[in-house]
Amino acid sequence: MTLIVSWSLNLLSNFVQAASEEPGKSSVGRKVTGFRLNDTAAGQRSFGELAGRSATVIVFLSTECPMSNNYLDPLAELAGKYEGQGVKLVLINPNRDEGQTQVAKHAQEFQIKFPMLIDLEQTVADLLGAKTTPEAFLIDADGVVRYRGRIDDQYISRLKRRESVTRHDLGVAIDELLAGKPITVAETEALGCPIARPVVPKHAKDSNAVTFNRDVMKILQDRCQNCHRPGQAAPFSLLNYRQAIKWALDIERVVTDRAMPPWKPIAGFGHFRDEQRLAESEIATITRWVASGMPEGDPNDLPPPREFSKDGWQLGQPDLVLTMTEEFEIYATGRDIIRQFVIPIGFDEDKWVTAVEFRAGNARVAHHAIFFTDSTGQARKLDAEDPLPGFSRIGFLPSGAIGGWAVGTQPQPLPDGTGMRLPKNSDLVVQMHYHPSGKPERDRSAIGVHFAKSPVQKQVAGLPVFGFRFQWPEGDDRIKTTGWFRVPVDVHAISVFPHMHMLGKEFKMTATLPDGTVIPLINIEDWDFNWQQAYFYKDPIPLPKGTIIDLESYADNSSRNPANPNNPPRLVTFGEQSTNEMCIGFIGCTADNNADFFDLLRLRRPRAQAGASIKREP
């Protein structure tokens, strides 16, 4: 099979029997013939030259979309599978802002060895009604579209993958076509990045109209630009008007659905610092702006550009920078990677930590990280036993934890007068979660540590509240897990860190004070393993001795859960791997009386909690 990567620099078209389709409208059953493309490697090419003897597959791709990039290797494999069977593959880039320089650089980075063209006028995209990258179209020998949609079902939603592909939709359609059979599933929804059509913005008709410069840019600066700027994790930037109108319709959809910015706790159930949840007024502003034609407005209304730290440290230069001891290679495509890396700290005295900041060595693949400490040397042994940098499973009981990071989160200093103890002669163990980007990558991330500059009056402890369940039966779509813990001394809660794995669906924690008052701690109703982080309360919450902290969660181990790592579902047991399951809520807290701190540490252990759970009633 000949692989023709047709990413058009200039597209000259002459359509004989095909009128343009409305984006998203089905083109299945329509005949497509007679267009010509400019191929920068071989000159002008006609559809007849590009078409396969038995069938032609057209796939729309983008250099910026990570989901599109992740299909480059599978598409090359598809090409090899059908070589010699009269099927040809044409890949088209329909994105107006991805010019020759960007495409050439992308081809070099991803080691694409084929001619590349760009559909600047989006003529072919309009012809087929394509709306997403990646999106595939299967055209038979007579020029009739027989299938359109996704390549396979590896993505549940944008950037959220299954553990394994369960249906190769495009491959199945090709097999059925070549066998002379009807296409069983002729159309599926393609998940990916939208193909941005040209927008003709309107001028504001009156002084009260919502404009980009006066109203929208400030929202993007405050809520989006941490990630949506060059060198960060987001697939595109939102730094100016041109970039914003390109993605405006998609921005409106994701903010209305509250898919972005990512913020999991539901409103009103706990009050947190630096909430990334958009206010209803902000959503309304974006919606009104799009509805009114996306006017730019008066240039004098544009706020000054947001300034970001040039050295990458948002809290300023750290007192200590701990860098992974060696680079780790991330494969191009496949399952996400969970990996632990040991970094020696090298202090012969305890240190008080007031803030920890993570700097991704490769923002394209780093998704989240958790920072443990180990004073036993067990992590070093696991690292030594694994031939690759780091090791693949926890396999040890951490001595403590000093924070974590996820895409889009900001470093959070501890309240004044508090600190986390970094034990002497210990190691930092960084648990990294990597997303493959579509090409081989390397990462060597760093953690910046800030030490206390004044005496620490209160030591922060992580209080784990365990959900006591050790088996998650297959087929059950609502598995309830509960746990509770009686606070042994007077404390103040400063943060909460929920933790479950792939089967998790809901997670809630409350605190019931001795007088019966119930305080909401956190409630997440759409758990996502890929978006877990610590949440810091706006104000420390007093929890008197005898307070009961309750945990309640639900998991789905049925085939209806697209995040289920097992197909078909199987019995899942408690364990450290993401394919195992667990349920823990970590409460960051300080003891009101320093003399009680070691009692808090002693009684927070799982065995102590298990014993206490037998005697819940006072």
Each language-model region and where it sits:
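A short beta-strand-turn-helix
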Residues: 35-56, 205-214
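Aromatic- and Gly/Pro-enriched helix-to-coil junctions and flexible linker segments
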Residues: 187-347, 425-431, 436-438
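N-proximal helix/coil linker or "cap" segments that precede and/or mark the start of modular domains
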Residues: 12-34, 48-51, 184-186, 190-203
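Thiol/selenol-based redox catalytic cores and closely related redox-interacting motifs
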Residues: 119-196
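Beta-strand-centric surfaces of beta-sandwich/beta-rich domains
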Residues: 265-272, 302-352, 357-492, 498-617
